[in-house]
A protein has these predicted regions:
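Expand to "…catalyze enediolate/carbanion chemistry for C-C bond making/breaking, isomerization
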Residues: 1-104
């Protein structure tokens, strides 16, 4: 059995400005919880599914760049689901690396 976390789809919502978006903090909280549960149970986290791009988009709010709802229209490029931008993706990757380094 492989345990996979998909922190993107369950955290999609329509923003006040009408854009389909995700809050980076919600994604991080779900990923962190996924690893904490597995660490507590002594099981192996198999992976995470993340929608991302290397582009400088503004499709998900939050992160170190502090993207706000009012910023979404600046570089909202997706034709389907909102993706983490390059900075948010790196933030998440470093968080996952930190959590993996704690695994027994």
């Amino acid at each position: 059995m492989t345990w996979i976390c998909d922190p993107m789809h369950g955290n999609t919502f329509e923003s006040a400005s009408g854009y389909k978006t995700r809050d980076f903090d919600d994604v991080v909280d779900e990923v962190r919880g996924f690893f904490e549960v597995h660490q507590g149970l002594g099981t192996v986290p198999g992976g995470i599914h993340v929608e991302l791009t290397g582009n400088d988009v503004t499709e998900c709010i939050g992160g170190a760049e502090k993207i706000l709802d009012a910023d979404l229209n600046k570089r909202y490029e997706t034709v389907c689901d909102p993706r983490l931008n390059h900075q948010q993706s790196l933030e998440l990757a470093f968080l996952v690396a930190e959590m993996l380094s704690r695994e027994p």
